[in-house]
């Protein structure tokens, strides 16, 4: 996910005040998901405010995400997440539930998503905690949490310390926010997510956009590259 090494060379040893020089910059991008498997936990909000269209749109988005990872890990949609990657499902309202552990079966993952029913309050802290617990078995794979929510925390402990602990343990956190009836604080999502915000947080007021946001995020996770490149030279 991003740049893992860079090297810069200049083609002269000395230079006059008005002279010019050629600077060569070599960048190595992080390998994609085929070479660098990932364990990904989709954390899905099923609180009462998600009832109706938001829940249906979230389900379609989550299933599209699963399909893209399926294809990216072995070159085709064969119903199995390949190359050592896995996906898990955690959903939350008053408390969080592990609907699917880290597995490779696309059918089982989609069944877990389809089983979700909206109702209750919004407990983000328990959602982050339960998702983090799925990574307790040692693994060399990347650890990724994708948090989807449509509103503010209304029950449970403050979620930020739990999210910070997850990041400190090596988990990368992405956030997708739907601006629901209770509103959403984007600064909170930015605080939960890994840096930089521009590539780890996406927010929309329209449930119809969710499938596209999930798809873009899946592509970002599975087909990495060098992004946000900045070159500063002072000669």
Regions found by a protein language model. Name each.
Residues 54-57, 76, 115-133, 140-144, ...:
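VWA/integrin I-like adhesion module and closely mimicked acidic/polar interface patches used
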Residues 6, 21-25, 88, 174, ...:
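Hydrophobic residues positioned within well-ordered beta-strands of beta-sheet architectures
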Residues 37, 84-86, 97, 142, ...:
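Exposed beta-strand and adjacent loop surfaces of beta-rich binding modules
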Residues 44-51, 63, 67-70, 80-133, ...:
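Short, charged loop segments at secondary-structure junctions
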Residues 2, 18, 33, 200-235:
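C-terminal "exit" segments of structured domains
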Residues 1-41, 46-56:
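Acidic, polar low-complexity linker/tail segments
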């Amino acid at each position: 996910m991003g740049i893992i090494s860079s090297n810069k060379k200049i083609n002269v040893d000395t230079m006059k005040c008005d002279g010019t020089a050629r600077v060569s910059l070599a960048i190595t991008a992080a390998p994609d998901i085929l070479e660098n498997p990932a364990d990904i936990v989709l954390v899905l909000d099923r609180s009462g405010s998600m009832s109706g269209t938001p829940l249906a749109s979230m389900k379609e988005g989550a299933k599209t995400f699963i399909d893209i990872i399926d294809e990216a890990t072995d070159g085709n949609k064969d119903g199995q997440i390949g190359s050592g990657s896995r996906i898990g499902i955690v959903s939350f309202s008053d408390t969080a539930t592990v609907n699917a552990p880290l597995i490779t079966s696309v059918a089982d993952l989609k069944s877990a998503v389809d089983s979700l029913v909206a109702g209750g309050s919004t407990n983000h802290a328990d959602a982050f905690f339960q998702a983090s617990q799925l990574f307790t078995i040692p693994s060399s794979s990347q650890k990724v949490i994708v948090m989807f929510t449509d509103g503010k925390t209304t029950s449970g402990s403050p979620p930020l310390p739990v999210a910070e602990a997850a990041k400190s343990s090596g988990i990368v956190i992405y956030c997708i926010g739907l601006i629901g009836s209770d509103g959403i604080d984007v600064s909170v999502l930015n605080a939960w997510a890994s840096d930089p915000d521009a590539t780890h947080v996406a927010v929309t007021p329209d449930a119809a956009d969710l499938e596209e946001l999930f798809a873009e995020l899946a592509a970002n996770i599975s087909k990495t590259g060098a992004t946000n490149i900045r070159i500063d030279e002072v000669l």
